[in-house]
Amino acid sequence: MHEYEQIITQPIFFLFVAFSLVLTWAYFRGKRRNRELYVSVFEDLVRIFKPDDQKFTNIGGAIGYHANLYIRKKKAFLSRVDATITMLPRHSLLYLPISKLIRKYDRLFLELYLKNPPSEEGHFLEKRYARFSKTRVANLDKLEAETVNWGGYDFDLLYGSEQMRQKLLDFLAKNPDPGGIRHIALVPEQQKCFIFMIPKKKEVATTLQPVYNWLPSLVKNM
């Protein structure tokens, strides 16, 4: 018993207890912050896309969630939206700094299923994100490219015709702030639009609404 009494009076023991308490506090605080983020993001997505049915799935404990939004309205230009959000491990105080170096930020991937294909391929691709993520555009050799500044970020504008170029530039002119958007891809072959963005709580709807309003003008027979 005397040996145990000596241990619990050592400064290192109190440091251990204090560190354990900090880790516990960080765990619950981090989980709460991640929950607030994904709930806010999914609420914004539902508000924009107005699905008739929806399914939410946990894919990574406190850091990953997936949503399937089904749209059955006849006049809608979308039939489905798949969304995946992966977040920094805010609940893990020890791993969070490493994750920030490796992953840098939270991520929201959107896959929009179009009822009719886009008239042609087009991209907004932020240069720093493209280098970091090593994003590759499959038909890059068939597309023209130019660099534009969008809200202080350098983006590659990729297009196959002057008509598509003008549509992309018109969108930029009407929406000077990309928010968290780092890539928008219109892919006729897959009849889809892909969007990657860095999600912020209570900002996803504001960022995505202009894109949602713009897409029907790019889809055939709409």
Q: What is each model feature region?
A:
Residues 1-15:
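Feature marks short, highly hydrophobic, charge-poor N-terminal signal-anchor/signal peptide-like helices
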Residues 3-6, 199-200, 206-210:
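Intrinsically disordered, low-complexity segments used for protein-protein interactions
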Residues 11-29:
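Single-pass alpha-helical transmembrane signal-anchor segments
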Residues 27-104:
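N-terminal topogenic membrane-targeting module
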Residues 35-38, 204, 208:
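Generic alpha-helical secondary structure
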Residues 45-48, 171, 214, 218:
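Residues that form generic nucleotide/phosphate-binding pockets
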Residues 76-206:
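Structured extramembrane domains adjacent to transmembrane segments
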Residues 207-222:
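Short amphipathic C-terminal alpha-helix that caps PH/PH-like domains
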